[in-house]
Amino acid sequence: DHTSIASFPGMKERTIYLNGFSKAFAMTGWRIGYICGPKELIQQMVKIHQYTTLCAPIISQYGAIEALKNSIPDMLSMRDSFARRRRLIFEGFKGLGMEIVEPKGALYVFPSIEKYGLSGEEFAIRLLEEENVAVVPGDAFGEGFEKYIRCSYATSIEQIKESIVRIGRFVKRLEEEKKSLEKYLPHDLIYRKK
């Protein structure tokens, strides 16, 4: 369970909370968010903000008000739906024998592709060409993610299931290719990329 740092003694006046409506209320593209914190700090932030950005569009502001007033049950339902999708994709990759850490938030997972001997980009391009499944190479998200791919589960249950089937076929072919290479090439040539 998540515990807000602001709930600890003496921390409310030392905490800044920044959030938006994109994920919680499915308002992606509306470009509206908010910040909570000590009044004195927020006043200083407003001085900078008012000269660097325009206000959120009126329709976005009304949408946010409606979301806060009447959409909490919908938000809870979406949260449960995404938890089911997260579990499905996580278990799917585990079932394929891929190393993966179950995320606690976000709308994507990062399975490891290290054992297949391809870079994230090579893996992503081949997967798209061979199985028509789009993933993002992990190195697009910074150093240390070179041996991972990012897979979104912000889609239907059916698409997640079908994607896992297709990725399963793809990694099986990669494993067969690797075994075939191992028969004919010296061990140090196969694993030189590491």
Which role does the model predict for each range below?
Residues 1-194:
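PLP-dependent class I/II
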